[in-house]
Amino acid sequence: MIRYVLVIITCFLVAAKSHVTIGPVPNNLGFPDRSILLALVAPTCEPELEGLVDECVNNVTIRNVCYDCFREGLTKVYSYCCHKYNHMYEWCLEYFSGEMK
């Protein structure tokens, strides 16, 4: 239950950040507060991903978190969600790039 609350909070923060950011974004693989988002997403992703095969597509919660992170340019979080457990980073990159077009 706590994991799902964290997911909702994370999605809200990512959505709010996209509306609040004004001016140039620093060129450091994402926004300045990406470590905060990573701290929120990491505990959520870990139990959900462990032992599952095609998590980026099959699990709606994790797919949405990964997609939001990818869309916001938070590549460190995106890589954590899709690559660390599944070694699917390239596949996910193509999948989400296609979704964004």
Curated annotation (Swiss-Prot):
One of its GO terms (cellular component) is extracellular region. It is found in: Secreted. Expressed by the venom gland. Contains 3 disulfide bonds. Keywords: Disulfide bond, Secreted, Signal. Residues 1-16 form the signal peptide. It comes from the Eukaryota. The lineage of its organism: Eukaryota, Metazoa, Ecdysozoa, Arthropoda, Chelicerata. This is Venom protein 214.
